[in-house]
Amino acid sequence: MRDLKTYLSVAPVLSTLWFGSLAGLLIEINRLFPDALTFPFF
Protein backbone atom coordinates (compact mmCIF):
# COMPACT_ATOMS: atom_id res chain seq x y z
CA MET A 1 0.00 0.00 0.00
CA ARG A 2 2.89 2.33 0.74
CA ASP A 3 4.33 1.74 -2.73
CA LEU A 4 0.98 2.66 -4.28
CA LYS A 5 0.90 5.93 -2.33
CA THR A 6 4.46 6.67 -3.42
CA TYR A 7 3.52 6.03 -7.05
CA LEU A 8 0.42 8.21 -6.82
CA SER A 9 2.48 11.06 -5.39
CA VAL A 10 5.31 10.75 -7.93
CA ALA A 11 3.23 10.32 -11.10
CA PRO A 12 1.62 13.81 -11.12
CA VAL A 13 5.01 15.45 -10.56
CA LEU A 14 6.64 13.53 -13.39
CA SER A 15 3.73 14.14 -15.76
CA THR A 16 3.77 17.87 -14.94
CA LEU A 17 7.49 18.06 -15.67
CA TRP A 18 7.08 16.02 -18.88
CA PHE A 19 4.18 18.07 -20.25
CA GLY A 20 5.84 21.31 -19.20
CA SER A 21 9.02 20.45 -21.06
CA LEU A 22 7.02 19.24 -24.06
CA ALA A 23 5.06 22.50 -24.14
CA GLY A 24 8.28 24.49 -23.89
CA LEU A 25 9.78 22.52 -26.76
CA LEU A 26 6.73 23.11 -28.94
CA ILE A 27 6.77 26.82 -28.09
CA GLU A 28 10.44 27.08 -29.06
CA ILE A 29 9.85 25.19 -32.33
CA ASN A 30 6.99 27.55 -33.14
CA ARG A 31 9.20 30.51 -32.28
CA LEU A 32 11.98 29.34 -34.60
CA PHE A 33 9.68 28.12 -37.39
CA PRO A 34 6.51 30.23 -37.19
CA ASP A 35 3.34 28.99 -38.89
CA ALA A 36 4.93 25.74 -40.04
CA LEU A 37 2.28 23.19 -40.82
CA THR A 38 4.99 20.78 -41.99
CA PHE A 39 8.41 20.83 -40.38
CA PRO A 40 11.07 22.04 -42.84
CA PHE A 41 13.72 19.58 -41.59
CA PHE A 42 13.71 17.33 -44.65
Swiss-Prot record:
Q: What is its main location?
A: plastid
Cellular component terms per the entry's GO annotation: chloroplast thylakoid membrane; photosystem I
* Functional description taken from the UniProt entry: May help in the organization of the PsaE and PsaF subunits.
Q: Which cysteines are joined by disulfide bonds?
A: none
- Which organism was this protein described from? Lepidium virginicum (Virginia pepperweed)
Entries under InterPro entries matching the protein? PSI_PsaJ (IPR002615), PSI_PsaJ_sf (IPR036062)
Q: What is this protein called?
A: Photosystem I reaction center subunit IX
**What GO biological process terms are annotated to this protein in UniProt?**
photosynthesis
KW Acetylation (keyword) present: no
Q: Look up and give the membrane topology term.
A: Single-pass membrane protein
State if Plastid is listed as a keyword.
yes
